[in-house]
Amino acid sequence: MSEPTTRLPAPRRDRDGVRRRVRCRAFALLAVIAPGTAPAGPGGFWLNVWPFPTVVVSAFLISWAAECAQFLVSQGMALAILAWLQALPEFAVEAVIAWSQQIHYMTANFTGSLRLLVGLGWPLIFGVAAFSRWTRDRRLLTRIHLDGEHSVEVLALGLPILYFLIIYFKGTLTLVDGAVLMAIYILYLWVLKKVPPRETEEMEDLEAIPRRIMRLPRRGQILAITLLFAGGGLLLYLAAEPFLHSMLRFAVYFGVSEYLFIQWVAPFLSEFPEKLSAMYWARRPEKASMALMNMVSANINQWTMLAAMIPIVYSFSVGFPTHIPFDSFQRAEILLTVAQSMLGMLLLSNMSFHIVEAGGIFLLWGLQFARPHLHTEVTIIYFAWVAYEVFVTLVVRRRLAAFGAFMHVWRAHAVRARSVPAPNR
């Protein structure tokens, strides 16, 4: 008789990996199922719960598509496409509010969405990446380093923020402002088009499904990426409205005020796909910069195209071309949002994101969320921090790292492309 084989214990790293996967799947299952246990509307449990797994699946599909697309176009362009698909719920919510001509809610939703992206989204990415690094290597992650090509997104974020200072001082959002903001976004896409795709050597760092797609022939890659983008976008489109309605029942049940829902709950839910994609990448610290740029791309999208859409929809609703006037409270909301995003842009202009910066941004967001009456004080703190960063950049470092990185990328790709002679026919 043969001797019974002895089963060797799995290596500690494998056991830790299994436990981590079990925890992640259990958490995902809880996140998907838990909403259905809330006070259900008409139709029963499954009719109320289906939007949640659908949104999760759509987020994974478009994340895989973007991860593959960065080898066919630039990573920034892939993330710009991703941001458009992910922003569909937010655009839908803002369009409905603009059509109903509720200016105070327009501003609340728009500014709340942007402040959530920076104040909660960016630190959340850092937190997930740091937790992943600690559980895997028992090392503290102190900084997320950006790639040189990410300077395009960082500098592009500054343009609409500066223009919104003009909007703040004049107190109106006009169709001309919308045209300027759209022009900024088109310029941003034009620059991204000049940046080349990622090197093929980096494909080995992909997850299993994107890696298999990139092993297909070129036509197969394009077809698979197109299907993933289209399928994920379609699922997101179908689930967006039921998803928001399900969460609205949560808000009503827990007594959340309508204004609070419009400013914080609705943007959080409409940005849920963006957060899912970013967390998917952030769990691998080496991909944390891509996760961060996913959020930055969403910021650019909302500062430009979302803001440009508002006066257009509002004018159609009124029946003639007009502008949106802001009162003192709405202008204060805009100024606070500008200050926060300006600070975020300056912090990333060093081509890295430090743990102290992530913590500071999160604490300031939490302060103005928990204590709305400290609105003015938080705005002053933001601008004081902005002034400090400008002083350090101009006097101490005497250079803007993002600008230097951008010029290197521009000379390496855009200028070189113009200098290469066209092939003889």
Which sequence ranges carry the predicted segments?
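Hydrophobic alpha-helical segments, chiefly the membrane-spanning helices
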Residues: 2-425
